[in-house]
Amino acid sequence: MAGIVVVGSQWGDEGKGKIVDLLCQTADVVVRYQGGDNAGHTVYHQNEKFELSSLPVAIINPNHLAVIGNGEVVNPKALLLEMKMLKERGLDISGLRISDRAHVIMPYHIALDALCEQASGGRIGTTKKGIGPTYADKINRRGIRMVDLVDPKSFAEVLKEFLPEKNNEITKLYGGQAFDFQTIYDEYVEYGRQLEKYVTDTTVLLDKLSQEGKRIIFEGAQGIMLDIDHGTYPYVTSSNPVGGGAAVGSGTGPNKINQVVGVVKAYTSRVGEGPFPTELKNEIGDKIRETGHEYGVITKRPRRIGWLDAVALRHSVLVAGITQLSINSLDVLSGFKEIKIATAYKVDGRTLDHFPANLRILENAVPVYETIPGWSEDISEVQRRQDLPVNAQNYLNRIEDLLKTPILAFAVGPHAEQTHLLKDPWSEDKEVLHTI
């Protein structure tokens, strides 16, 4: 078996779905290993645009298995609506498999997410999808799993045990409205009935596929800088998008992973609150936002924009074990006379070349920029690295130098045919720095 993990190397929205869709052409299985329906993926298939949040990107290809791993949290209502949408658009979703160990987002999780966010004054900026409260219940051993949802008797038992606790929290702590047991039970038992045929022990399934020599892609959600352990805590998600999260969130041993592809936007974007050292609060940021259509797939919120941050990216390469890079949105930078890359931070007279954990330091960090000449040419139809304008080639070369990691692919537009591989992604040879 060969396994490739695809991770977002920044604060999410790097275009992971596009590279996963491209890699799918030579793979057999795609596994989502963390996150939930708070993370949107936009892919184009046969000139159609698909916006997915719950399902792995591979679901749009009938020749692949699309697996929701144990590390993902599942909103059954949202999942079924997404499945219905794909069916109505003529897609075959019979390749879907859902881990029986995946945890279920319940209506009280969504309510608690909104109430907590309101109480904090929107400090974290969650999507209010119930992701955080679901992961919290998982850690507190108060969660409901898919294996419970598809068994009406088991579901009744766990719901009867946990619902009073949640209602107490909602009403007494936040002054919210309590949930009725029978209403939730009737609704969610029906969801379980509809999803039952897709639910299985995906750990056993993936092991079987591995022994058969199948190629497996592990698809991360969000980005490494939002990782619960390694991101800009507390302005983070509730799971581990890092490469190591793929093994935990899929039930697959780390020895089954051969490569970790870090997807990098050619600049930086972020949604919500939190430190952002290279943020551009000026006309340059506005131009990049509009040219790159930088609005959230799920939230529709305008994304914050900044120059490429090599300090943050070095941190991502380190903690995620990134072996190769995929550079997206290179075309968005066409037309700029100069492009900047942050290579270090200045804080209180000191120079930092690593990404600090201390939020106060991050919030006061002043980027040390390296300026690179830009290019004016339209590159949206370029297919080979050597055919890019010289300055665009130099920009890619400098990214490789700063991160000490080779580029596997680059994209010059949003469509699959505008993403170009520089080598066989399944090859063990990683020495492609500046050679293509």
UniProtKB/Swiss-Prot annotation:
Binding site for GTP: 12-18, 40-42, 303, 329-331, 411-413
Entry keyword set: Cytoplasm, GTP-binding, Ligase, Magnesium, Metal-binding, Nucleotide-binding, Purine biosynthesis
PROSITE patterns: ADENYLOSUCCIN_SYN_1, ADENYLOSUCCIN_SYN_2
Reactions catalysed: IMP + L-aspartate + GTP = N(6)-(1,2-dicarboxyethyl)-AMP + GDP + phosphate + 2 H(+)
Subcellular location: Cytoplasm
HAMAP family linked to this entry: Adenylosucc_synth
Protein's recorded name: Adenylosuccinate synthetase
Species name: Oenococcus oeni (strain ATCC BAA-331 / PSU-1)
